[in-house]
């Protein structure tokens, strides 16, 4: 009697090529989480992880020939586009910043970037920043309240948070009289991170508490698509500038982005100031860590305008 072969396999299912949609354009986004742990990440992305996300690493800073290693913290904001404002599009992605435990200096180390309690940044001579010499006359406009040197990456991170929380500038210029006016309550304009040292120890409590202040807020970002040398494409975001929700004129954002691209930044990334829409591309490898919930393993490459940085 001929026996039918016995298979110890279930029937399975039809195989299909997985193509993840990529999007390009301006979009208001909700912030769902910041540096989520393993359980939170699995819930957000409806997936299972073999290991917990690691947000700490090291990187090199400084000019060629005089580089040094410093601690680095990756800050991942998991964001989702507002479908009511994006023609039904629900884009789930990340806005990533890298903070280095080093201060940001110019090329000859004569100036350092500083930040005040209002989250305003500028460049000052090192002596002026330390308080060992007076502020130059041409910099007297800068409010030095609780001023301190800024970490590399802090300015961009602070700007994102200010735009997300809809924090006002402490002053504005009357368009008719050109007179500078201050808001009634300057405390409303305060915006500075005070526990950054904790980030390099893996403690992101300050950031997690910040996004809870206005959980229903949205911030506008410019999203794009980056193409690698092997023709793979990934979701990208312009992290140098974000906009408050009520802003509808994107010309300055576009001008800034175009100037940076002309200087050599984002050489393989395409951006648009049109409303968010699907970017038609071929299938790519979405097993790459850059498109996964754990994120990229290292910081993005440097750009021509990046200032040399010194250790803290």
Predicted feature descriptions by range:
Residues 1-312:
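Short beta-rich binding modules
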């Amino acid at each position: 009697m001929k026996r039918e072969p016995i298979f110890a396999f279930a029937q399975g299912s039809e195989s299909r090529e997985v193509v993840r949609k990529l999007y390009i354009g301006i979009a208001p986004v909700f912030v769902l989480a910041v540096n989520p742990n393993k359980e939170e990440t699995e819930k957000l992305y409806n997936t299972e992880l073999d290991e917990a996300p690691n947000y700490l690493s090291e990187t090199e800073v400084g000019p060629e020939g005089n580089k040094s290693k410093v601690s680095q913290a990756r800050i991942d904001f998991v964001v989702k586009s507002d479908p009511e404002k994006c023609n039904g599009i629900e884009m789930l992605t990340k806005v990533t910043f890298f903070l280095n435990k080093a201060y940001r200096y110019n090329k000859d180390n004569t100036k350092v970037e500083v930040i005040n309690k209002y989250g305003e940044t500028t460049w000052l001579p090192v002596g002026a920043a330390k308080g060992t010499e007076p502020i130059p006359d041409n910099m007297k406009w800068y409010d030095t309240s609780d001023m301190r040197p800024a970490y590399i990456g802090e300015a961009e991170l602070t700007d994102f948070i200010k735009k997300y929380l809809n924090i006002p500038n402490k002053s504005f210029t009357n368009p008719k009289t050109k007179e500078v006016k201050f808001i009634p309550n300057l405390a409303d304009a305060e915006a500075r991170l005070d526990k950054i040292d904790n980030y390099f120890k893996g403690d992101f409590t300050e950031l997690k508490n910040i996004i809870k202040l206005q959980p229903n807020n949205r911030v506008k970002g410019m999203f794009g698509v980056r193409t690698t040398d092997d023709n793979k494409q990934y979701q990208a975001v312009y992290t140098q500038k974000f906009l408050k929700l009520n802003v509808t004129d994107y010309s300055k954002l576009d001008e800034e982005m175009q100037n940076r691209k002309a200087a050599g930044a984002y050489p393989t990334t395409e951006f648009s100031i049109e409303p968010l829409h699907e970017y038609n591309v071929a299938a790519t490898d979405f097993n790459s860590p850059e498109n996964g919930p754990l994120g990229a393993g290292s910081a993005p490459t440097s750009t021509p305008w990046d200032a040399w940085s010194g250790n803290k």
